[in-house]
Amino acid sequence: MTERQKTYFDLSIGGKPAGRVVFEVYSDVTPKTAENFVRLCAGDAGECRTKPGVPLCYQGSLFHRVIKGFMCQFGDFTNGDGTGGESIYGEKFEDENFARKHDRPFLLSMANAGPNTNGSQCFITCAPTPHLDGKHVVFGEVIQGKRVVRAIERQETAADRPLADVRIDACGILPASYEVPADAEATPADEYGDDYEETLADDAKVDLADPRSVIRAVEAVKAIGTAQLQAARFDVAVQKYAKAAGFLQEYFPDDLPDADVAALEQLKVAVHLNLALAALKAGNHQRVLSAASEVLHGAADDKAKAKALYRRGLAYHHLKDPEMALTDLELAATYQPGDAGIAQAIVNARALKQKLREQQKKALSKMFS
């Protein structure tokens, strides 16, 4: 059996080292396509025919196209914008086969401009992409550095191009004896004690088949958010609550027992209430609106609805929208009659409404005086 070769990219994002990604290519399934990639990593295939003087090598080139939830594309070392690149066999070569499917994230596949137009451009899948089956040749996978791929996937983009350069600083072939370290994909805890990946599916600690494992992950990150809220690190609290909320959004299989659905729904309400509170204290009023709205669209009881409406009403007040603030606050009062905080917020919103009305009158009188 043909031994599968391993190659690596050492990457930087915005000029800062981002880590190493290690690939295993399917030399036994797609030998010609795999050999093209390996030689372009090694940089030992000479110069481009289309651009003499430019090495046939990925080193120094960029990830020029990134679409979250889809793929990260690279390999245009001649033009840098997706219009160039070249294979070791010439400008283009044929589709070898479509034996492997795009059935999971972290697969390595050839980019092309149609049938039999493979060059040097490739992409890493960020999710299953079955619509590409039969059109693009899957020839390898990421076996180390999945967190680095996710970091690339999360980059802010304009027209799908990362705003910060994602560069292949170095690349090459690893020895046949190379083995991925046992702890290579372990998530290091951050300074707040959070050792969970940004995506549940990427975290080896979480068993997606067990709702209790998911709940433990959400509660752990939520607890970190609460600790940061109590320490008045409001921006960090927002980040952690948002991460916990993202876990819940990511996970909700159709076949869960009713008891597990109820537990997850209640946890979702609690996380979004806390997110709204932390965002309010951080001055992130748009985030308050979205988090509070999630509570109101969920399985919230009257007490939770009152809190969500109160926090959303305060956010509208800060956004100088007293009409919306009063709508929320007056409805909150029906769920929590006699609450002094809600009552005072209503008084404040009415005062803001009057103040803005008087300012408008003055502005109009100046226009017509």
Curated annotation (Swiss-Prot):
Keywords: Cytoplasm, Isomerase, Repeat, Rotamase, TPR repeat. It comes from the Eukaryota. Its EC number is 5.2.1.8. PROSITE patterns: CSA_PPIASE_1 (PS00170), CSA_PPIASE_2 (PS50072), TPR (PS50005), TPR_REGION (PS50293). It is found in: Cytoplasm. GO terms for biological process: protein folding; protein refolding. GO terms for cellular component: cytoplasm; intracellular membrane-bounded organelle. TPR repeats lie at residues 218-251, 269-302, 306-339. One of its GO terms (molecular function) is peptidyl-prolyl cis-trans isomerase activity. Residues 8-173 form the PPIase cyclophilin-type domain. The keyword Repeat applies. Its main location: cytoplasm. The keyword Repeat applies. It is an enzyme of class 5 (isomerase). InterPro entries: Cyclophilin-like_dom_sf, Cyclophilin-type_PPIase_CS, Cyclophilin-type_PPIase_dom, TPR-like_helical_dom_sf, TPR_rpt. It catalyses: [protein]-peptidylproline (omega=180) = [protein]-peptidylproline (omega=0). It holds the Pfam family Pro_isomerase. PANTHER family: PEPTIDYL-PROLYL CIS-TRANS ISOMERASE, PEPTIDYL-PROLYL CIS-TRANS ISOMERASE D-RELATED. Belongs to the cyclophilin-type PPIase family. PPIase D subfamily. PPIases accelerate the folding of proteins. It catalyzes the cis-trans isomerization of proline imidic peptide bonds in oligopeptides. This is Peptidyl-prolyl cis-trans isomerase D. It comes from Eremothecium gossypii (strain ATCC 10895 / CBS 109.51 / FGSC 9923 / NRRL Y-1056) (Yeast). The gene is CPR6.
